[in-house]
From Swiss-Prot:
A GO cellular component entry from the record: plasma membrane
Main subcellular localisation: membrane
Family per record: Belongs to the TRAP transporter small permease family.
Biological-process GO terms, alphabetical: C4-dicarboxylate transport
Name of the protein in its database record: Putative TRAP transporter small permease protein HI_1030
Pfam families recorded: DctQ
Alphabetical list of PANTHER family matching this protein: 2,3-DIKETO-L-GULONATE TRAP TRANSPORTER SMALL PERMEASE PROTEIN YIAM (PTHR35011:SF2)
Origin species: Haemophilus influenzae (strain ATCC 51907 / DSM 11121 / KW20 / Rd)
Parts of the chain that traverse the membrane: 13-33, 51-71, 86-106, 135-155
Keywords associated with the record: Cell inner membrane, Cell membrane, Membrane, Transmembrane, Transmembrane helix, Transport
Keyword hit for Membrane: yes
Subcellular location: Cell inner membrane
Membrane topology designation: Multi-pass membrane protein
Organismal lineage: Bacteria, Pseudomonadati, Pseudomonadota, Gammaproteobacteria, Pasteurellales
Gene Ontology terms for molecular function: transmembrane transporter activity
Length: 161
């Protein structure tokens, strides 16, 4: 059940990222054609593309984190025995969970502060850019919590992956 929910969320994020990238590409291409071909443009596309890019970066980071595609230095980890690797994984996941809390807290404050500041052309609240990091922080925290539970389970059962 939990694995299928995680798979569903992962697929939904992939589809959302693909959709955001496609929409961004269309908006930017349309604006370039209008500017250079017809000497006019749609000014709102720049703001919307910026907002979409921010959301794409944060949601893409969640996808990369979920699939262990982020950069990591494993020189020390690979030399440890499996139990030591599990302990180190637990410690690093706990530290990342603390960082996620700080990101969520700071981004939530910025979201609230900037909710009444509006973009000049589109009129969208500028707090939406900070809300992307809140959502990303929550999703990464959920991934970390499931990893921590799995690591604890394997450490205490003596079955270390």
């Amino acid at each position: 059940m939990m694995r299928s929910l995680a798979h569903f969320i992962n697929k939904a994020l992939e589809i959302l990222c693909i959709s955001i990238l496609a929409l961004m590409s269309i908006l930017v291409f349309l604006n370039v054609v209008l500017r250079y071909g017809f000497n006019s443009g749609i000014s709102i596309t720049e703001e919307i593309s910026r907002y979409l890019f921010i959301w794409l970066a944060f949601l893409g980071a969640v996808l990369a984190f979920n699939e262990n595609q982020h950069v990591s230095v494993t020189v020390l980890v690979n030399k440890l025995p499996p139990f030591g690797q599990a302990i180190l994984k637990f410690i690093t996941d706990m530290m990342m969970l603390i960082c996620c809390y700080l990101i969520i807290e700071g981004s939530w404050i910025q979201f609230q502060l900037n909710l009444n500041n509006f973009a000049p052309i589109s009129g969208l609240p500028q707090g939406l850019t900070y809300f992307a990091s809140v959502i990303a922080g929550i999703l990464v925290s959920a991934i970390l919590i499931t990893r921590l539970i799995s690591t604890i389970f394997f450490i205490f059962r003596g079955e270390v992956k």
